[in-house]
């Protein structure tokens, strides 16, 4: 920062974006307050923070800045979703929506959910690894077909893991009923081979996506 600017950053939420034995992606929602002269601006962005385990501790080895998908203009449904969620949207997720690059099916699903519950989005595309972590397979996030949600009903998904009927589980069930083809969550809602799955990676968020 220049001499006449001061910045303070705060971590809103760190969420796993990929997990291997000795490395991980931690998608970190960061809110930054910058005062320049008499003006204060605030931005919230999601960064792909890469960490590695050296046998003793986990260390940050890279921070990948978010990018925005190319697009044109948001659909009416996306505009309405922004109005519903904007206080809970990181700027990177907002940019993906305003670019019109988020899949219509995903926008419609989130719009229905926002009508009945409150939730906070971590990431659509910007800030998410381009590939499924540790593989060469493109992520549905990269094409605007996936979303990660870290908080539902005012509580983190992580804190709702052990509850048989929680707001987070209700959102996952809504996505399953709506035809989402990937539902990563702390619970497997439809058994082996179905759209829903649970693993160590998806204990701290909901991953909702549609295949192309």
Label each PLM-derived region with a short phrase.
Residues 1, 17, 124-133, 191-192:
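Acidic helix-start/capping segments at beta-turn-to-alpha-helix junctions
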Residues 37-41, 137-138:
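Short consensus segments that form the blades of beta-propeller domains
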Residues 102-136, 184:
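Extended, low-complexity, intrinsically disordered C-terminal regulatory tails
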Residues 1-5, 96-101:
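Core segments of small alpha/beta cavity-forming domains
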